């Protein structure tokens, strides 16, 4: 598939957008006694995905009247497209309390967001060597990625939000009697844009088609193909992530528009549109 928290590494990854002079830097001394002034609009930035977990943190903020009025600390998973991290936590699937934490991830994220709105400057969230903070009561998770993403977002300036509602979206086709696979599509939307894509499938045994191929069980190269199925579908995912639309397709659902792709891909683009019906 293409496109942090309690198990991030101590060393924070670099943020994606950070000019040398920033509004955030200009207000780095603000701890709430002064009002930070930012241009009104929507602010969004990410940091690099965590290599172990696949979670890619982002900060999404709204500035009104020169002040941060809304803050969203969230993440999407580059290895397993679908629900955003808050939703995973809200559904009880992230399991911090089960692991001994005092509260779930989304509850701690909400406290960090409220602190940022109060202080108006991500630099007010002081960090220790492990990327944690003592500045926010009830927050034990690593907050480095949130701070870095928020700083990068404020540095980059307002951005235009995309057309879709944020969240995870899923669609699946019918079981193919000949192949024994049913196509599946999972998309993640953040700041209104598609940020993660997974084109895969499932068989009667519940196997994930991409993983089935990664494990060497699908056997396309053994059958004479130039690449394995998961390698080809990754190129299709990248195309969709960049273009947001289907390429020109043959009557068989194949395409010459994506180099190195010989598999049938038409159904995935149809299912992607179906999945996004819930995002409009």
Task: Say what each PLM segment does.
Residues 32-40, 44-164, 175-280:
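Active-site- and interface-proximal helix/loop "cap" or "latch" segments in soluble metabolic
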Residues 171:
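Active-site rim loops that border cofactor/substrate pockets in soluble metabolic enzymes
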Residues 2-29:
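Bacterial lipoprotein signal-peptidase II cleavage site
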């Amino acid at each position: 598939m293409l496109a942090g928290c309690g198990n991030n590494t101590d060393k924070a990854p670099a943020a994606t957008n950070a000019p040398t002079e920033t509004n955030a830097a200009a207000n780095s001394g603000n701890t709430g006694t002064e009002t930070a002034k930012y241009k009104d609009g929507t602010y969004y930035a990410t940091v690099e995905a965590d290599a172990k977990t696949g979670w890619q943190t982002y900060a999404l903020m709204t500035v009104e009247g020169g002040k941060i009025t809304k803050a969203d600390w969230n993440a999407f998973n580059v290895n397993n497209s679908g629900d955003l991290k808050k939703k995973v936590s809200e559904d009880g699937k992230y399991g911090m309390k089960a692991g001994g934490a005092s509260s779930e991830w989304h509850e701690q994220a909400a406290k960090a967001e409220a602190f940022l709105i109060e202080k108006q400057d991500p630099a007010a969230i002081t960090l220790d060597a492990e990327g944690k903070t003592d500045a926010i009561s009830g927050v034990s998770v690593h907050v480095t990625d949130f701070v870095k993403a928020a700083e990068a977002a404020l540095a980059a300036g307002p951005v235009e939000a995309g057309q879709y509602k944020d969240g995870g979206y899923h669609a699946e086709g019918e079981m193919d009697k000949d192949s024994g696979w049913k196509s599946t599509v999972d998309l993640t939307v953040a700041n209104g844009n598609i940020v993660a894509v997974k084109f895969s499938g499932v068989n009667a045994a519940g196997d994930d088609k991409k993983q089935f191929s990664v494990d060497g069980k699908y056997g396309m190269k053994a059958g004479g193909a130039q690449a394995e199925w998961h390698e080809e579908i990754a190129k299709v995912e990248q195309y969709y992530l960049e273009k947001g639309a289907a390429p020109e397709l043959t009557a068989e659902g194949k395409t010459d528009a994506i180099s190195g792709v010989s598999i049938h891909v038409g159904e995935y683009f149809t299912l992607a549109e179906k999945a996004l019906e819930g995002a409009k």
